[in-house]
Amino acid sequence: MWFSGKKEQTIISLFFKHIDKVEETLKCVFDLIKKYLEDTDDIESLYLRTQRLESEADRLRRKTEMEMYSGAFLPNFRGDLLGLIESVDKVANKAEYVADLIVLQKPEVPHELKDLILSQMEYSLKAYESLKSALKFLFEDLERVEEFVLAVEKYEHDEDAVERTALRKLFEMDIERSVKLEVKELIRSIGDIADRTEDVSDRAEIILLKRRF
């Protein structure tokens, strides 16, 4: 680890806790989606857990930011890290939004699209897991960061391909327009999780380049 100060170590520990909590949020939303697509009514507990996890992630973000304002890190890196934290939190925000869509709107997802939507979420989760590794290696082993940045790009690309297929199938279906629009929003929003994950990965790559040069 290339930071040894006590303040810096505290912040890095909080940062790791934050990215872990966001991963918990994503996994909970994935479980909620699976339950919903299985036509079960038992999603309320998962919805409440999603809200709790996202709130915990938010508190960790704020705590990390407050610690950073105490003067830890050089100003340039401090700004980069703040940007990372905010971007990671947006991933959790979008995941919670997906849960809101499902619980509040209850979109009528056609059977033909269920596996595609699950694949979207699987790729989004794999992208985030790769991102988490990239972010941890950013502080532990810079040489390992790039392989996980590339993995994020791959999984985001895979998700995007599934998303396009799902949307194409959706609009070929003979169903009510209102249903199409609700399902479209769900598909797009899951895609946004992968997109936001890649946005964080791009920030990590920029920090990597700065550290190298």
Swiss-Prot record:
InterPro entries: DUF47, PhoU-like_sf, Put_Phosphate_transp_reg. It holds the Pfam family PhoU_div. Belongs to the UPF0111 family. This is UPF0111 protein TM_0914.
